[in-house]
Amino acid sequence: MWYSKCSWTLVVLVALFALVTGSCLEYGHSCWGAHGKRSGGKAVIDAKQHPLPNSYGLDSVVEQLYNNNNNNQNNQDDDNNDDDSNRNTNANSANNIPLAAPAIISRRESEDRRIGGLKWAQLMRQHRYQLRQLQDQQQQGRGRGGQGQYDAAAESWRKLQQALQAQIDADNENYSGYELTK
């Protein structure tokens, strides 16, 4: 009897574990997004999407301060004046500290990328709008039998007809003038 209860419990536990494996419940989240009830906390989502800035800037500044401190101690061990050691420390710190920490640069780059992305999105919207207008104009032109579109051959034929008609009219004027004097 106890064997059947134990085996049934094990089957249920294995089945539950199989259902949980690979889902968000495996990681301790309580998201029911697929069912539309609730999703994970906003702080958790933001932490996943926006990782902390790179600590390279902080590490490099700490390393430079450590090296400057060692240089300062070496200068004091050489029995130099305090003025000389201060000048060395100041010169070293001015040359070694970066102008902007990489963490700040990465924030600026991400903002620039975001702004650049918005600019590209706006340009693409304008391009799609202009393309849609052009396609609409072309479709309207085809629907009316080609009217509304520029046709170079038809335009040159029209100009040729006008030039020939002007020539015929000019010849008629000149010819009719001679006949009147008769």
UniProtKB/Swiss-Prot annotation:
Main localization (coarse): secreted
Modified residues (Histidine amide): H35
Glycosylation sites: N174
Cell compartment(s), UniProt: Secreted
Signal peptide coordinates: 1-22
Keyword presence, Magnesium: no
GO molecular function: neuropeptide hormone activity
Tissue specificity: Expressed in endocrine cells of the larval midgut (at protein level). In the brain, expressed in the optic lobes, lateral protocerebrum, subesophageal ganglion, and intermediate and superior medial protocerebrum (at protein level). Expressed in DN1a neurons but not in other clock neurons and expression follows a rhythmic pattern controlled by the circadian clock (at protein level). In the posterior midgut, expressed in enteroendocrine cells (at protein level). Low levels in larval brain with higher levels in larval and adult gut and adult brain.
InterPro entries per record: CCHa1/2
Region described as Disordered: 67-103, 133-154
Keywords on record: Amidation, Disulfide bond, Glycoprotein, Hormone, Neuropeptide, Secreted, Signal
Propeptide: 39-182
Null mutant phenotype: No effect on developmental timing or on levels of the insulin-like peptides Ilp2 and Ilp3. Reduced and delayed behavioral activity, particularly in the morning, with significantly longer siesta. This phenotype is not further exacerbated in a PDF(01) background. No significant effect on free-running period or activity rhythm and power in the absence of a light-dark photostimulation cycle, but enhances the reduction in free-running activity power and rhythmicity of PDF(01) mutants. No effect on photic entrainment of circadian rhythms.
Disulfide bonds: C24-C31
Induction record: In the brain, rhythmic expression is regulated by the circadian clock. In midgut enteroendocrine cells, induced by a high protein diet.
Biased composition (Low complexity): 87-103
Any one Gene Ontology BP term: neuropeptide signaling pathway
An example Gene Ontology CC term for this record: extracellular space
Functional summary from the UniProt entry: Neuropeptide ligand for the CCHamide-1 receptor CCHa1-R. Neuromessenger mediating signaling between neuronal cells of the circadian clock network involved in regulation of sleep latency (the time required to fall asleep), amount of sleep and depth of sleep (arousability). Together with PDF, involved in regulating intensity and periodicity of daytime activity. In subsets of clock neurons modulates the rhythmic expression of PDP1 and PDF, and together with PDF modulates the rhythmic expression of circadian protein PER/period, but not TIM/timeless.
Protein name: Neuropeptide CCHamide-1
Organism: Drosophila melanogaster (Fruit fly)
